[in-house]
Amino acid sequence: MTSKTNMTSNKFAYDFFPWSNDTNSSQQIKNIKPPPKRSNRPTKRTTFTSEQVTLLELEFAKNEYICKDRRGELAQTIELTECQVKTWFQNRRTKKRRCTSPLRKSMMKKSDERSPSPQNPSSQHVQNLQTFFHSWPSHFAYSLPSDQQNNV
């Protein structure tokens, strides 16, 4: 009785999966080799020259996302692979987000409060701009109209 059920189940398998009984396909499966194992060594880190970084930064300043065509041109110009340029842009966007995050700003504010400095550099910059703009008309051959002339 058991042999009859085995035959029925085999016929079922053969009807739905005819390749399962094919010796040629099972031989092909045995010949498939797994992909080669990666070595335990880490991949070599790319060291960019100052010229490469300058050109990459200039391109990033124009556009944070580089299209495929421009990436190819830039990669060829600075003698890098497209993958290296793409990765540099990804890392640079991450760096920008990290540097402009609210958490980082709050940490910077706390560190500014801790370190005694005679004057905050940003406030010094604002004062320099104010001084420049107060004396601005004297830098030019013509003078700007005064408030009295506008009221006449």
UniProtKB/Swiss-Prot annotation:
Sorted alphabetically, the Gene Ontology cellular component annotations on this record are:
nucleus
Task: Say if the entry is tagged with keyword Nucleus.
Answer: yes
Molecular functions (GO terms): DNA-binding transcription factor activity, RNA polymerase II-specific; RNA polymerase II transcription regulatory region sequence-specific DNA binding
Protein localization: Nucleus
Q: In what ranges is there compositional bias, type Polar residues?
A: 21-30, 116-126
> Where is composition skewed (Basic residues) in this entry?
35-44
Q: What is its main location?
A: nucleus
* Keywords attached to this entry: DNA-binding, Homeobox, Nucleus
Question: Whereabouts does the entry annotate DNA binding, in residue ranges?
Answer: 41-100
> Which Gene3D superfamilies does the entry mention?
Homeodomain-like (1.10.10.60)
Q: What InterPro entries does this protein map onto? A: HD, HD_metazoa, Homeobox_CS, Homeobox_TF, Homeodomain-like_sf
* Chain segments carrying region Disordered: 21-48, 92-126
Q: How does it assemble?
A: May interact with homeobox protein ceh-14.
What is the purpose of this protein? Answer: Probable transcription factor, modulating expression of helix-loop-helix protein mbr-1, perhaps acting in concert with homeobox protein ceh-14. May play a minor role in axon guidance in the DVC interneuron.
Q: What is this protein called?
A: Homeobox protein ceh-63
